[in-house]
Amino acid sequence: MRTIYCGQLNKSHLGQEVILCGWVYRYRNLGRLIFIELSDREGRVQVVFDLTHPSIFSNAAKLRNDFCIQLHGIVRTRLDKQINYNITTGEIEVLATNLTILNSSQPLPLDINFHNNEEQRLKFRYLDLRNPEMAQRLKLRAKITSLVRHFMEKKGFLDIETPMLTKTTPEGARDYLVPSRVHKGQFYALPQSPQLFKQLLMISGFDRYYQIVKCFRDEDLRADRQPEFTQIDVEASFINAEQICKIMEDLVRHLWREIQEVELENFQYMSYTAAMYRFGSDKPDLRNPIEIVDVVDLVKNTTCTILADIAKDIKNRVVALRVPNGAKLSLNDIKKYEKYIQTYGIKFIIWMKVYQGKDGVKTTQSSITKYLLPEDIMSIIERTGACDGDILFFAAGNNNIINNVMGALRIKLGCDLKLNRENSWAPLWIVDFPMFEKDDEGNLHAVHHPFTAPKNIDIPTLLQYPLKAKANAYDMVINGYEVGSGSVRIHCAELQQTIFSILGMTRNEQSSKFGFFIDALKYGAPPHAGFAFGLDRLVMLLTSTENIRDVIAFPKTTTAIDLMTEAPSIGNTIALKELSIEILDKNKI
């Protein structure tokens, strides 16, 4: 029905007859001339109807915005004063020689040219996607997936599909369950990831696997998380951590080069401990110059008893954040930040403004200056690197709480004061994660997942000191977002069973939940490692948006509702009966 897309027309097509299909983006009737802008996925072009074709002109007079049409026309140049530099086709226009109205349109319930509220956009998503900005994001997503496929194929990876209906396994989040009609009272689970299947493929001899795959997690949502999401899933045999990281790093460099036309700087390597200690986060945004600095040794002997008492306990930290040019913050500004950190479990922060006098000597303004010796103040200034016009924020308390509080405050200050380097990328690898950590009940759980291999530790030592074990895992972080995660896998059945035991799983439970996998490891399982990117998050970064819903064609809300189709919905009574499912009164549960 068409010979070319609207947005692809240019001066090389002058004099040619073209057939275009699309929607009326803008309509102007000047009496003897009718102008429309015709829009399709590639862009817009101006079309002119004049009285040389009376029947066509009469038909064009019926047009309104968002009518779906087909037209024939001749490409011609515009006069210089009529060139529209806001669109790529602005130097040319099409003189219509034929017009077919394919479908009329009611007035749209939203305006695709202006900002609409999120609820309206999601309810009428099919119209929201006509917005050129939204369309461009989805086109870039398609290009990114194409680039990924070509890259992985060149590296020798095979695209192999894994099941969508599988067995529920403990991977951190809740599973989405699918009841079986044939096997009453039993359920499939939608996969949180293809983790076990891709490891089984390694045992099968398919030494390089990848898949762009849907995954499902029933967890609390936020701006960069959806109940169903897409992974670039990767696994390889006879490979170590450095080698798989190099391949994944090369892939990311390739994407940034092709999409952003940027050569990424070198990827730093940083341990989990260092990241938490310096930035209060395992996914630090290194564009932000603020860093957490430990000053516990400098305040141990202060007469400020609150700080001194906290500093004496090795489980605590006393830290400072240096905020460049932060001395301009008013007392009201500081109170807002004090209120902000209280939501993280800290009752107060202490501040100190730093100035440099005419004599070159640094002076301070702070409520705690009187409790500190002059030499201690100078030591704090020297250690934090504070300069004229900076402000220092101090906090003290339990290690983990302080890391969380000051990490969050660091991010907020960086955003509020626009301290992050603009138009830059700060990629890094976070490594040497703890293998296990304790939950609120004191039970151990895997920091990544239970199939991650520990780093340089034998089984007896692992059993005796599980919290000292480091995971052979690695996360890729870009601008404060974890874009991907991976690890070297366990390929020994005995070690895998040991990990399950440490996590409190009995041998019977292991056999029931993972017996097939443990058995598979006994048949010559090769050393292997893997990685998975969150495709949605990658596309979000590459298209410079802050909401993952902007790069998904039909996303859910933060309460996991599809406003367009009104899913989830109440189950059909007959279908529920066939599945032996009874809906309980939620007030009685």
Curated annotation (Swiss-Prot):
Keywords: Aminoacyl-tRNA synthetase, ATP-binding, Cytoplasm, Ligase, Nucleotide-binding, Protein biosynthesis. Residues 195-198 are annotated as: Aspartate. ATP binds at residues 217-219, 226, 482, 534-537. One of its GO terms (cellular component) is cytoplasm. It catalyses: tRNA(Asp) + L-aspartate + ATP = L-aspartyl-tRNA(Asp) + AMP + diphosphate. L-aspartate binds at residues 171, 217, 448, 489. One of its GO terms (biological process) is aspartyl-tRNA aminoacylation. GO terms for molecular function: aspartate-tRNA ligase activity; ATP binding; nucleic acid binding. PROSITE patterns: AA_TRNA_LIGASE_II (PS50862). It is found in: Cytoplasm. Pfam families: GAD, tRNA-synt_2, tRNA_anti-codon. It is an enzyme of class 6 (ligase). Its main location: cytoplasm. Its EC number is 6.1.1.12. Belongs to the class-II aminoacyl-tRNA synthetase family. Type 1 subfamily. Catalyzes the attachment of L-aspartate to tRNA(Asp) in a two-step reaction: L-aspartate is first activated by ATP to form Asp-AMP and then transferred to the acceptor end of tRNA(Asp). Homodimer. This is Aspartate--tRNA ligase.
